[in-house]
Swiss-Prot record:
This is Small ribosomal subunit protein uS2. The gene is rpsB. It comes from the Bacteria. Residues 242-253 have a biased composition (Acidic residues). Signal peptide: none annotated. One of its GO terms (biological process) is translation. The keyword Flavoprotein does not apply. It comes from Nitrosococcus oceani (strain ATCC 19707 / BCRC 17464 / JCM 30415 / NCIMB 11848 / C-107). The keyword Phosphoprotein does not apply. Pfam families: Ribosomal_S2. Belongs to the universal ribosomal protein uS2 family.
Length: 269
C-alpha cells in the first residue's frame, strides 16, 4: 500500500485548487476555503480517498487487471511515462486519439502496423529500400510510436483508467464511461467529480503533486502484484506438501497391506 502522508501532500501543493471564479460547485464538499481567491482543497478529504483509490487499483493488479495511465498535459507527460513503465502498465501521455477505447479494434491494427515497422528496422529490411522510402517508414514509425507507444503491448481493453485531470482528458473519460470501464482520477476544483468512479480531490497542474499521485498509484499496483504472487507461491507450496503427504500415506498403506498379506500367507503355510 502506498505510504503517503498529509505532510507530503502539503509539501507537493496538492491542496492548491484553481481560482475561485472557475470552481465547480460539485466540488464544494472537498474544499476547505479560499486564500487570495484560490480555493484550498481539504486534505482530510483527499488523503483517505487517495488511499481508497490506490487500494482499489492494487487489488485490480493483484487479480491481473490492466490499468491504463492517462496524462497528456505537459506537466504529466514524463511522470506518466516513468511511473506506468515502472509498474508495467500501459499509458497515453502524448495525445488521446478519438476512439482509442471505443474503436479499439482499429487501434489494434495501427499497433500491428507499428510492430511491423519496428521489425523492418530491426531486421535490416529497411536497408533494402530506397532512401526516400526508408525515410517515410521511419517517419511513420515515429508518428505511431508517439501516439501509440505507451499502449503497443496492450492486447485488450483496460480494466480501469487512472487519469490526471478529468477535464483535460474528458474524451478518454467519456469513452471509458460508454464502455463501463471504471475511472480513477485526480479532480481539481474546476472539474465535475461525478465523471470519475474513484476521485482524488487535488491539484492537477503542479508537477510535484502529479508525481506524488503517480508514484503512490504505481507503488500500490506493484504491492498488489507482489502480494498476489507471494500468496500464489504459498498456495503452490502448500498444495505440493499435501500431495507429498498423501503420497507418503498411500505408500505406507501399501507397505502395510503387503506385510499383512505376507504374514497371512506364512500363517496358512
Amino acid at each position: 500500500m502506498a505510504n503517503v502522508t498529509m505532510r507530503q501532500m502539503l509539501e507537493a501543493g496538492v491542496h492548491f485548487g484553481h481560482q475561485a471564479r472557475y470552481w465547480n460547485p460539485k466540488m464544494a464538499p472537498y474544499i476547505f476555503g479560499k486564500r487570495n481567491n484560490i480555493h484550498i482543497i481539504n486534505l482530510e478529504e483527499t488523503l483517505p480517498l487517495y488511499m481508497e483509490a490506490t487500494n482499489y487499483l492494487g487489488r485490480l493488479a493483484a487479480n491481473k487487471g490492466t490499468v491504463l495511465f492517462v496524462g497528456t498535459k505537459r506537466a504529466a507527460q514524463e511522470p506518466v511515462r516513468e511511473e506506468a513503465g515502472r509498474c508495467g502498465m500501459p499509458y497515453v501521455n502524448s495525445r488521446w486519439l478519438g476512439g482509442m477505447l471505443t474503436n479499439f479494434q482499429t487501434v489494434r491494427r495501427s499497433i500491428k502496423r507499428l510492430h511491423d515497422l519496428e521489425a523492418m528496422i530491426q531486421d535490416g529490411s529497411l536497408d533494402r529500400l530506397k532512401k526516400r522510402e526508408a525515410l517515410t517508414v521511419r517517419r511513420d514509425r515515429d508518428k505511431l510510436e508517439n501516439n501509440l507507444g505507451g499502449i503497443k503491448n496492450m492486447t485488450h481493453l483496460p480494466d480501469a483508467l487512472f487519469v490526471i485531470d478529468v477535464e483535460h482528458e474528458r474524451i478518454a473519460v467519456d469513452e471509458a464511461a460508454k464502455l463501463g470501464i471504471p475511472v480513477v482520477a485526480v479532480v481539481d476544483t474546476n472539474s465535475d467529480p461525478r465523471k470519475a468512479d474513484y476521485i482524488i480531490p487535488g491539484n492537477d497542474d503542479a508537477i510535484r503533486a502529479i508525481r506524488l499521485y503517480l508514484r503512490g498509484i504505481a507503488d500500490g499496483i506493484i504491492d498488489g502484484r507482489t502480494t498476489a504472487a507471494a500468496a500464489s507461491a504459498s498456495k503452490a507450496s502448500k498444495d505440493e506438501f499435501v500431495e507429498m503427504e498423501e503420497a507418503s500415506e498411500e505408500e505406507t498403506l501399501t507397505e502395510s497391506l503387503s506385510e499383512k498379506s505376507a504374514s497371512t500367507d506364512a500363517s496358512v503355510t
